[in-house]
Structure formats: structure tokens, C-alpha cells
């Protein structure tokens, strides 16, 4: 379990970026696989989700998850609906005791909190979602709801590190076409190109005017017993992979 020091200061919320330890899954999913979309046994995933939620709430669990699509779509949860299928990549709420969850396996989980309005968001940002502007859309929604940028606190959770995120030339060209300033997120070593996802997201948050940003510098690729990693599983020839979960709620 990893916590943001900046968010930890605020007692009206609870959060956690969880790793794979402590669950009941076995095999390639060993530990706390929370991915409903994985090929793991459904009963194990359900048990793991309950265990994860109890890390931040001992009371009745109301957990909202997404059908994540690497998009820039978000949902503002005003009324709790357990059966609703939320399709997109960000959740926002002001409701108390409602846990927002994001699943990742190399992509970045992001939390945003307005300390005055008591508004929270959980964002799933892989390169596609970040490129499409999911972070910008969520921040704009906060502002529309009355947030002042100086009151926003953001935390970027564990994701794949730059040294393990090799990309192709077409990938880099796509980002440079967006703006040549994106070149700073790429590094060239031994004829290979590497991309920094968390740095790219950090600079987006800064450009939007958020100054209080925490980067959890934990690599999901290595070591293998700490987090689930889609890229590592593919490299090892595994047919599937587990998902890490990140949770945030207003008390």
C-alpha cells in the first residue's frame, strides 16, 4: 500500500495506491488481483476487491469502478448506482463514503482533490488517455464546479518507469506532432527510445495551473512481486495479467 504525502495531510479523505500483496489469487495473478476483466477466478477477484476496500473503509462498502477504455470520458457520480456500468476513464464525486476505484497494470492512476469543495476524482491515464486529454477534461470540470486551482491537490500513482517503457518511432512522432515540446518526455539509449508517462502527466497538471502535485515514484514493471504489469506479462509470454487497484473516498 502506497500513500501520497500531500493527500495524507487532509483528514477528510482516505486513499491508497495498492500493490499486489495480500490477496487470494494464485498463479500469474498471485496476490491481490482486482481486475474483473482478467481471466482470474471471479470469486478471487471479488474477495480481493473487498479486502482492498477494507484498507480504507471498515464500514459498508460502496465501490464504483469503470469499464476503462483509454478515453477522455469522465463520470460525475451524484447518485450511487451499484448496477450502472460506467464506461470511461475518470470518476468524480462529492458524496461521502463512496469509494472511487481505478485499475492499472502500467498505466498511471491519478487522484485529484479539492480541499475546499471536498470534491475528488480518480483517473486512469495510460498514454492514450493522457494524450486525448483526460486530465485536462477532469480539471476543467472541477473548475466548472467552482474549484480554484490553488485548492487542488494531485497525486500520480505507481506506473511503468521510463527505463522500462520502450516505444517506437511512430509513437514518438505522434507526440511531437501534438507539440514539439513533448520531446522532453523521450530519452534515447542504445538506439532505443523510452517514454516517461508520469512526467508527461505531471507537466499537463502544471500547465493546467495545479502546483501541489505528488509523484509516487514506484515502477510497476520491476520488481515483479510488487505490482502487476501488462508489459512485463507480455514480455514473459503470459496470456493475461492482474490489475492493481487505487482507491479514494471522502469520509
Regions found by a protein language model. Give the residues of each.
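Active-site microenvironment for binding and transforming phosphate-containing groups
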Residues: 1-251
Amino acid at each position: 500500500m502506497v500513500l501520497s504525502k500531500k493527500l495524507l495531510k487532509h483528514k477528510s479523505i482516505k486513499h491508497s495506491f495498492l500493490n499486489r500483496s495480500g490477496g487470494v489469487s494464485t498463479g500469474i495473478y498471485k496476490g491481490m488481483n482486482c481486475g474483473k476483466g482478467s481471466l482470474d477466478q471471479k470469486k478471487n477477484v471479488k474477495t480481493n476487491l473487498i479486502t482492498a476496500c477494507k484498507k480504507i473503509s471498515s464500514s459498508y462498502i460502496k465501490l464504483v469502478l469503470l469499464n476503462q477504455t483509454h478515453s477522455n470520458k469522465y463520470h460525475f457520480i451524484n447518485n450511487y448506482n451499484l448496477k450502472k456500468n460506467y464506461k470511461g476513464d475518470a470518476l468524480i464525486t462529492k458524496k461521502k463514503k463512496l469509494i472511487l476505484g481505478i485499475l492499472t497494470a502500467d498505466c498511471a492512476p491519478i487522484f485529484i482533490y479539492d480541499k475546499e469543495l471536498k470534491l475528488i476524482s480518480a483517473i486512469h491515464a495510460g498514454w492514450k488517455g493522457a494524450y486525448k486529454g483526460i486530465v485536462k477534461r477532469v480539471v476543467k470540470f472541477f473548475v466548472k464546479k467552482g474549484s480554484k486551482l490553488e485548492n487542488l491537490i494531485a497525486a500520480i500513482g505507481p506506473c511503468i518507469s521510463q527505463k522500462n517503457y520502450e516505444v517506437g518511432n511512430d509513437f514518438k512522432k505522434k507526440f511531437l506532432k501534438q507539440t514539439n515540446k513533448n520531446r522532453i518526455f523521450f530519452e534515447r539509449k542504445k538506439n532505443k527510445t523510452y517514454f516517461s508517462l508520469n512526467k508527461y502527466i505531471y507537466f499537463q497538471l502544471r500547465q493546467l495551473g495545479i502546483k501541489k502535485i505528488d509523484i509516487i515514484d514506484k515502477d510497476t514493471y520491476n520488481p515483479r512481486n510488487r505490482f502487476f504489469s501488462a508489459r512485463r506479462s507480455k514480455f514473459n509470454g503470459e496470456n493475461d495479467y492482474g490489475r492493481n487497484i487505487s482507491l479514494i473516498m471522502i469520509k
